[in-house]
Amino acid sequence: MAANMYRVGDYVYFENSSSNPYLIRRIEELNKTANGNVEAKVVCFYRRRDISSSLIALADKHATLSVCYRAGPGADTGEEGEVEEEVENPEMVDLPEKLKHQLRHRELFLSRQLESLPATHIRGKCSVTLLNETESLKSYLEREDFFFYSLVYDPQQKTLLADKGEIRVGNRYQADITDLLKDGEEDGRDQSKLETKVWEAHNPLVDKQIDQFLVVARSVGTFARALDCSSSVRQPSLHMSAAAASRDITLFHAMDTLHKNIYDISKAISALVPQGGPVLCRDEMEEWSASEANLFEEALEKYGKDFTDIQQDFLPWKSLTSIIEYYYMWKTTDRYVQQKRLKAAEAESKLKQVYIPNYNKPNPNQISVNSVKASVVNGTGTPGQSPGAGRACESCYTTQSYQWYSWGPPNMQCRLCASCWTYWKKYGGLKMPTRLDGERPGPNRNNMSPHGIPARSSGSPKFAMKTRQAFYLHTTKLTRIARRLCREILRPWHAARHPYMPINSAAIKAECTARLPEASQSPLVLKQVVRKPLEAVLRYLETHPRPPKPDPVKSSSSVLSSLTPAKSAPVINNGSPTILGKRSYEQHNGVDGLANHGQTRHMGPSRNLLLNGKSYPTKVRLIRGGSLPPVKRRRMNWIDAPDDVFYMATEETRKIRKLLSSSETKRAARRPYKPIALRQSQALPLRPPPPAPVNDEPIVIED
């Protein structure tokens, strides 16, 4: 019952989205609307993930400690050798990376922003406290639902400010304390230079005479306000003018004038009414206009007694001293007393607490086991496992959980276990640091285990945006041994041809462990390599002479710039057309493909430039309807990566491939965006390979 009772001042979780983390808010008011619902007026707290990276770097810089150390000959006296440097918190350095990662999830940023949210969106209580340097950082991790903050975030101005004052430590900021005087020792300092007397207690006047002089000073102040036009506007009645003249600034000025005139009342009265007119003393209550007073009350309602923020956001033309002085005078006015009584009456009529039952509705991100398609991949699990059990949790990498939740973009098909989902909703992050953060070289998104072997995704963030994600297969030593010892059980060729057939990796591992002691005693049988005789090698070299070195190739930009849309020939697509309007490889590179209707095009003699399968003729003009788009003069962007394609080689491409050396073929495969310079030469007709010699006698070559 007490856990579901929420009061003003509680820190609570609010849920605004089923997939996003909870919002952390502090309840300021509980109001009941006209339709009977309860709304909570709350103060916003922001997480590190909610603010920009530049402000995060500024916050991390603020978290460093300034340590002063002394070195050199003046270390004892402190006269020289004092150096100040910024170092990281030593306690933060000793923490492991996992705890550092989780500690960042506990840091919040306070804001002055208020918003109203439905009370039914509350999902639980939490605790938020100001960062205390005397407490251990681990203490924040040991307590559940515990957060801390040290900076104030302004979502409108996008700035960070310190929430408390700082005390600077060091000889430059501390007062010099003199030595303690001994008993009977006199102070040699001149006290007249250290103190200023403003009133003489043993003066010749009695208290009655001083009171009469103060009455005269109030009368002079009232008369001065009657003569001043601006004061007449601000104080329209005689009663208000007399009240303004009776404030402390008039009395202090009268007593100061009496002290300066050596307590001679006649001279003091003459000083209050000089030749130009009576002296007018006004304080901050009279200096401020009505509009400025309204701005101050509005700022005080929003920021409280944070006079620095009041000055910056509402009254930048006023000094901080003037604002503070006006505040303490404003508290003595009748307006403040009336507002205080009105707020107390409103607080009595408002709700003090509200009961919110537990939220038991199912989350839309829950993964239903019955709705998962029952198709598995090699290594996803043994027969009898639930579908999709091979995909591990993105946070803790477990494969067993009573409930799974979808997490991240839908195309990534990532999921979290029940405990990690709760951690994600409360703390706004994963338990383990990700590889994208640069904190560990562990698995990344879409961690799958084909054939029961751990797979590690690529750490580059660009792969996270692709529909099909590349992965790196890291085989262990035991896996490589199992491929040889348990070949009849594993059947690697069959598994490669049927990647959707499940493989019982546990049984293979057990069988490999049983066969391993026997296999270590028998030597490994290596496959014998049959070498060709020397005569066959000589005949092959005679038949296939070394091709001449090609001429230097022009740069890709110059080659592409010389082509015009009318001279650009499309590529014949011999594969099946894409479905659902998917773009082909040629469309990604700015070249449209023609449909192949059973026609065969032959390579012309002037077609001497190939861009990895795309021919660019210089003289042949293709007759077709419409115009071709120009070729893009840039490399293919990784975002525009094509879908999987099927390349069917023709007789023309086979002939062209035979004209290229192996180094040119490999170079073209490594740089598919580079054009291929093909030297036009008549290819020699291929002769059948010579038969192997009958005799095994060596061949002797005489000079």
Swiss-Prot record:
Q: Where is this motif: SUMO interaction motif 1 (SIM)?
A: 699-703
Task: Please provide the Gene Ontology terms (biological process) for this protein.
Answer: chromatin remodeling; circadian regulation of gene expression; double-strand break repair; entrainment of circadian clock by photoperiod; female pregnancy; locomotor rhythm; negative regulation of gene expression, epigenetic; negative regulation of transcription by RNA polymerase II
Presence of the UniProt keyword Protein transport in the record: no
Any one Gene Ontology MF annotation carried by this entry is: transcription coactivator activity
Q: Which residues form the SANT domain?
A: 283-335
BAH domain: which residues? 1-164
Q: Where is this cross-link: Glycyl lysine isopeptide (Lys-Gly) (interchain with G-Cter in SUMO2)?
A: K549
Q: Which residues carry this modification: Phosphothreonine?
A: T564, T578
**PROSITE patterns cross-referenced by the UniProt entry:** BAH, ELM2, SANT
Q: Glycyl lysine isopeptide (Lys-Gly) (interchain with G-Cter in ubiquitin) cross-link located where?
A: K182, K614
Phosphoserine: modified positions: S386, S449, S522, S576, S627
Origin: domain of life? Eukaryota
Q: Where are the zinc fingers (GATA-type)?
A: 393-420
Record domain ELM2: where = 165-276
User: GO CC annotations?
Assistant: cytoplasm; endoplasmic reticulum; Golgi apparatus; microtubule; nuclear envelope; nucleoplasm; nucleus; NuRD complex
Q: Where is this region: Disordered?
A: 437-460, 542-583, 661-703
Q: Which cysteines are joined by disulfide bonds?
A: none
Keyword Transmembrane in annotation: no
- PANTHER family annotated for this entry? METASTASIS-ASSOCIATED PROTEIN AND MESODERM INDUCTION EARLY RESPONSE PROTEIN (PTHR10865), METASTASIS-ASSOCIATED PROTEIN MTA1 (PTHR10865:SF5)
Family classification? Belongs to the metastasis-associated protein family.
Self-association and partners: Component of the nucleosome remodeling and deacetylase (NuRD) repressor complex, composed of core proteins MTA1, MTA2, MTA3, RBBP4, RBBP7, HDAC1, HDAC2, MBD2, MBD3, and peripherally associated proteins CDK2AP1, CDK2AP2, GATAD2A, GATAD2B, CHD3, CHD4 and CHD5. The exact stoichiometry of the NuRD complex is unknown, and some subunits such as MBD2 and MBD3, GATAD2A and GATAD2B, and CHD3, CHD4 and CHD5 define mutually exclusive NuRD complexes. Interacts with RBBP4; the interaction is direct. Interacts with BMAL1. Interacts with CLOCK. Interacts with COP1. Interacts with CSNK1G2 in the cytoplasm.
Q: What is this protein called?
A: Metastasis-associated protein MTA1
Source species: Rattus norvegicus (Rat)
State the taxonomy lineage: Eukaryota, Metazoa, Chordata, Craniata, Vertebrata
